[in-house]
């Protein structure tokens, strides 16, 4: 059976059998045209046959795909680059290829982490990279220092107890994010900034609105975990990136609009390289974002008697915020307030402390899920088995000794009613005795206490009026409540106190 092969402008006939596979035909074409093919760690160069617009697989036979006498097949030489490295994400359980040139192996771990952040959307401060042997890779070293070769699979590990939280952020699940927030104050603030960063990168509107309401700001740097707050010299440069930069890199137009409406300072927020959001969207060729940011930057802010260009308005606002920050810092310095790490806080130092970036789950990290706790009531048979008295306050508290709660056994109903009547009679006697004592003191000492005469002298100075509108109401309400609970007016109480004092 004769078929024709079209290759690079030539049209050559080939005699083949209908039972031949596509792979055999490719070998015939390679030998006829002397095409050099190769395959190594960096990539491969191979042939591809197409018939009726579809690519043919090597295992297919010609008859199975309907190739008959005088059919024409197109042949192409294709080159495919293999990933330089692979990164296994412990959060998503996916393996991410890193398609860069071989020169990447001569660069530092810091450069690789910058590329990984642009691909996965995680801030550089929430994860670390490890070699296949589990050795943590530090930013200051090169990839060759860890014997990293082409095709090596590295592992991305996050903070212990953060897997579920970060997965909720990557999926935009607000309830899951709220469920796995930390109970430590500084860590909680850091998690909210991380959530806003990931939401901005992925374009989740609902999660973005929640993070903004929680106090996270789009022009505020994500920063580092509080455990690494003292490792300033070893920090990655991208820890100063803000959520507005993540939205600009990903081309999330709706998020950019929300951030600019929240604060116009986002327009002039710069990253570690000194790039504004407008520069970043230019670099990544996001046309819609470029047009929006340009229109905002060249707009004006109108006041009752003046209109100010947006750039000037941002400068004024930045100057005011710096002045407020300086004044606040000065007042706090005079008050001797101390910020930062305190005694007992966890501090991590590279190479010395036990690593806390091993991607442990929430429960394995020692956290307790309040939503999964189920309280069990003791059985009724055990409640009536003992006659020991039990403190009623202890019923609402968990029993750490795992003992069943025990109550008084039920008594006879007639004896219980008699006991209740006896208690009521005693209470009445006590109340009557107290009232007799009060009357005795009142009748005995009231005539002996002289009251000051009422002054009717007029003064020339104006009367004093209390400015609070509700002052009269507060005084009357306090007097009425005092009379209700004590049974005496404030005037009678004052006389009583003077009499007792004498």
Curated annotation (Swiss-Prot):
Gene3D superfamilies noted in UniProt: Ankyrin repeat-containing domain, Phosphatidylinositol 3-kinase Catalytic Subunit, Chain A, domain 1
Secretion signal span: none
Full protein name: Protein ANKUB1
């Amino acid at each position: 059976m004769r078929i024709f092969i079209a290759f690079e402008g030539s049209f050559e006939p080939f005699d083949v059998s209908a039972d031949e596979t596509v792979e055999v035909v490719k070998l015939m074409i390679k030998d006829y045209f002397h095409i050099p093919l190769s395959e190594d760690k960096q990539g491969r160069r191979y042939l591809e046959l197409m018939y009726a617009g579809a690519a043919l697989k090597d295992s297919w036979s010609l008859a199975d795909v309907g190739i008959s006498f005088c059919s024409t097949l197109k042949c192409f030489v294709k080159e495919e680059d293999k990933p330089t490295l692979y990164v296994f994400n412990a959060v998503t359980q996916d393996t991410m290829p890193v398609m860069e040139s071989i020169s990447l192996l001569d660069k530092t771990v810091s450069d690789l982490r910058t590329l990984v952040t642009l691909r996965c959307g995680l801030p550089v401060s929430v994860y670390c990279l490890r070699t296949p042997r589990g050795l943590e890779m530090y930013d200051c070293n090169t990839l060759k220092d860890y014997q990293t070769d082409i095709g090596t699979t590295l592992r991305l590990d996050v903070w212990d107890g953060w897997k579920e939280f970060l997965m909720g952020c990557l999926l935009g699940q607000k309830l899951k994010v709220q469920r796995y927030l930390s109970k430590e104050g500084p860590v909680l603030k850091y998690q909210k900034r991380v959530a806003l960063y990931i939401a901005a990168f992925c374009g989740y509107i609902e999660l973005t609105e929640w993070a903004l309401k929680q106090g996270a700001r789009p022009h505020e740097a994500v920063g580092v975990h509080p455990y690494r707050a003292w490792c300033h010299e070893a920090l990655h440069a991208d820890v100063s990136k803000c959520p507005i930069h993540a939205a600009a890199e990903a081309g999330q137009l709706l998020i950019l609009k929300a951030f600019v409406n929240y604060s116009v300072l986002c327009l002039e927020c710069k990253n570690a390289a000194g790039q504004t959001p407008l520069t970043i969207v230019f670099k990544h060729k996001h046309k819609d974002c470029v047009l929006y940011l340009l229109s905002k930057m060249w707009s004006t802010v109108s006041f009752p008697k003046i209109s100010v260009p947006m750039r000037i308005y941002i400068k004024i606002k930045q100057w005011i915020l710096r002045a407020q920050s300086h004044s606040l810092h000065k007042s706090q310095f005079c008050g001797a307030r101390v910020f930062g790490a305190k005694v007992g806080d966890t501090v991590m130092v590279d190479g010395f402390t036990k690593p806390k970036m091993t991607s442990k789950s929430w429960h394995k990290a020692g956290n307790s899920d309040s939503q999964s706790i189920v309280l069990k009531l003791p059985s009724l048979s055990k409640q009536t088995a003992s006659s020991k008295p039990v403190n009623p306050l202890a019923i609402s508290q968990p029993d750490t000794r795992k003992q069943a709660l025990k109550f008084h056994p039920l008594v006879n109903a007639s004896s219980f009613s008699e006991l209740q009547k006896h208690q009521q009679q005693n209470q009445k006697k006590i109340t009557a005795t107290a009232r007799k004592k009060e009357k005795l003191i009142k009748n005995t000492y009231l005539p002996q206490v002289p009251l000051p005469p009422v002054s009717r002298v007029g003064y020339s100075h104006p009367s004093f009026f209390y400015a609070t509108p509700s002052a009269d109401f507060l005084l009357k309400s306090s007097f009425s409540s005092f009379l209700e609970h004590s049974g005496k007016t404030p005037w009678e109480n004052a006389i009583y106190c003077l009499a007792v004092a004498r």
